[in-house]
C-alpha cells in the first residue's frame, strides 16, 4: 500500500488545514533540494511530503483520500462510478463491502477495472447477478457499438520553484488504458451475428432487475448484434499498460497549470481515437523565495555598515547572480526591484520582477569592539527614533 499521507506529514487524521500547512512548511524547509543539494534521500522525502500536502491541503482530495485511500489518486478514478460500484458490491454480498472508510477494509480499484474489463465479475457480457448491468451503470456502450474516443487523463507532476521559473523536462511513467493488441481495440474475436438473447431486437426482459420490466439487452447492449468477446480484454478493447514518455514543462507554470499532450490519453474503444493527456503541475513552496503571480520576493540580509554606508551586494536569482547597489542610509524593509528577474509569463507577456526586501542584521555576539561601535553609533541619532510612534 502507498505511504500514509498523514504519517508522511506527521499529523493526526483529525488535523486541521492549518496544522497540515504548518507541518508541510516545516518538512519542506528541512528537505527542500535547494537546502540539500545532491542529497537524493532528501529529494525523495521532499517529493513524498509535497505529494501528501497536495492531497491533504485540498478539501475534496482529502475527502476522497479518507474514503477510498490511495486508489483515489490513480489514473481514471471516478468518484461516482466508485460509489456506485461499491454499492453494487455490497448488495451482491462481496468481500470488502461498501460504506467502509479507507483505513478499515478499504476500496479496491482493481475490482472496478477487473469487472469493467472482464478481469473478473462482470465478464464478457458485462452483466451482474440479478440483472444489474455494470456496463450501463458506468455509461459503457455495447461492445458492438461504434468506435468511441478514449478518456482524457491527468497526471500530476511536482516541481520546485526553480523548475517552474526556468522550465524543465520530466520523464513520466504511468498506467493507462491502452489498445488491446489481440483484437486491435475492436473488443471482439469473431464475426458479428444476430444476438441470440434478444433475437436482434436489442430489448430483453430482466428477471430480478432493480426496476423491473424490459431494458437494453445485457448481451448486445441494445444493438441487436453480438460477437464473441476478445479473450484478452473481455470485450472492452483496451488493457491497462505502462506508458513512458518525456514531457516538456514550459517556463512560468504555477500550481494548477495544465500541459496538454494530444493523443496520449486512454485508448479509444472499438478502434476509436485516443484521448488526451493533461500534465497538471504542483509547484512547491521555496524556503526563501515567495511568489506572487509572476513576481518573486526575497529577503536580502545586509549588515549595519552596508545599510548605513551603502554597498554593492551579490544576490542569487534563478537566472544567475547579479550585483545590486544598496544605497546609503537604507532602512530595514526597504524594497528594491530587479526588472525582468521574476517568472516568465505563460501568456507571452512581460516577464515578472524580483523584489528584494532589505533586512538589516546586527551581530549575534556583542564583543567589546562591537559595543564601542554601537555606543558611538547611538550618538549619531538625532533625538528619539520613536518620537512619532503614536497610536
Curated annotation (Swiss-Prot):
One Pfam family linked to the record: DnaJ
Compartments, as annotated in UniProt: Cytoplasm
Gene3D superfamilies in UniProt: DnaJ domain, Heat shock protein DnaJ, cysteine-rich domain, Urease metallochaperone UreE, N-terminal domain
Domain of life: Bacteria
Entry keyword annotation includes Zinc-finger: yes
Residue ranges occupied by any J domain in the UniProt entry: 4-69
PROSITE patterns with a match to the protein in the record: DNAJ_1 (PS00636), DNAJ_2 (PS50076), ZF_CR (PS51188)
Ranges occupied by CXXCXGXG motif repeats: 180-187, 195-202, 217-224, 230-237
Subunit relationships: Homodimer.
Comment field on protein domains: The J domain is necessary and sufficient to stimulate DnaK ATPase activity. Zinc center 1 plays an important role in the autonomous, DnaK-independent chaperone activity of DnaJ. Zinc center 2 is essential for interaction with DnaK and for DnaJ activity.
Protein name in the entry: Chaperone protein DnaJ
Organism: Myxococcus xanthus
Lineage, uppermost ranks: Bacteria, Pseudomonadati, Myxococcota, Myxococcia, Myxococcales
Amino acid at each position: 500500500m502507498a505511504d500514509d499521507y498523514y504519517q508522511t506529514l506527521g499529523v493526526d487524521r483529525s488535523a486541521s488545514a492549518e496544522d497540515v500547512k504548518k507541518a508541510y512548511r516545516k518538512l519542506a524547509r528541512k528537505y527542500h533540494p535547494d537546502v540539500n543539494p545532491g542529497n537524493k534521500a532528501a529529494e525523495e522525502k521532499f517529493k513524498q511530503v509535497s505529494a501528501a500536502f497536495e492531497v491533504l491541503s485540498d478539501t475534496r482530495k482529502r475527502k476522497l483520500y479518507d474514503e477510498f485511500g490511495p486508489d483515489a489518486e490513480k489514473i481514471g478514478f471516478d468518484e461516482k462510478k466508485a460509489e456506485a460500484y461499491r454499492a453494487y458490491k455490497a448488495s451482491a454480498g462481496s468481500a470488502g463491502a461498501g460504506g467502509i472508510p479507507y483505513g478499515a477494509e478499504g476500496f479496491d480499484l482493481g475490482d472496478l477495472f477487473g469487472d469493467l474489463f472482464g478481469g473478473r465479475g462482470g465478464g464478457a457480457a458485462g452483466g451482474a447477478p440479478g440483472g444489474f448491468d455494470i456496463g450501463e451503470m458506468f455509461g459503457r456502450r455495447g461492445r458492438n457499438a461504434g468506435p468511441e474516443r478514449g478518456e482524457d487523463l491527468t497526471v500530476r507532476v511536482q516541481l520546485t520553484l526553480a523548475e517552474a521559473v526556468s522550465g524543465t523536462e520530466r520523464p513520466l511513467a504511468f498506467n493507462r488504458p491502452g489498445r488491446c493488441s489481440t483484437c486491435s481495440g475492436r473488443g471482439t474475436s469473431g464475426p458479428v451475428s444476430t444476438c441470440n438473447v434478444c433475437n436482434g431486437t436489442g430489448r430483453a426482459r430482466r428477471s430480478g432487475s432493480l426496476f423491473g420490466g424490459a431494458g437494453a439487452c445485457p448481451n448486445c447492449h441494445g444493438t441487436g448484434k453480438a460477437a464473441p468477446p476478445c479473450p484478452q480484454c473481455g470485450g472492452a478493447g483496451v488493457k491497462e499498460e505502462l506508458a513512458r514518455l518525456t514531457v516538456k514543462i514550459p517556463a512560468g507554470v504555477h500550481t494548477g497549470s495544465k500541459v496538454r499532450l494530444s493523443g496520449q490519453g486512454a485508448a479509444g474503444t472499438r478502434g476509436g481515437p485516443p484521448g488526451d493527456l493533461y500534465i497538471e503541475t504542483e509547484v512547491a513552496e521555496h524556503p526563501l523565495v515567495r511568489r506572487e503571480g509572476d513576481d518573486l520576493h526575497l529577503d536580502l540580509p545586509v549588515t549595519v555598515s552596508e545599510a548605513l554606508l551603502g554597498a554593492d551586494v551579490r544576490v542569487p536569482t534563478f537566472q544567475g547572480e547579479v550585483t545590486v547597489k544598496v544605497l546609503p542610509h537604507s532602512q530595514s524593509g526597504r524594497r528594491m526591484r530587479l526588472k525582468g528577474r521574476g517568472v516568465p509569463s505563460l501568456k507571452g507577456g512581460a516577464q515578472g520582477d524580483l523584489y528584494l526586501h532589505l533586512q538589516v542584521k546586527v551581530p549575534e555576539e556583542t564583543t567589546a569592539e562591537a559595543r564601542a561601535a554601537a555606543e558611538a553609533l547611538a550618538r549619531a541619532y538625532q533625538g528619539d527614533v520613536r518620537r512619532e510612534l503614536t497610536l
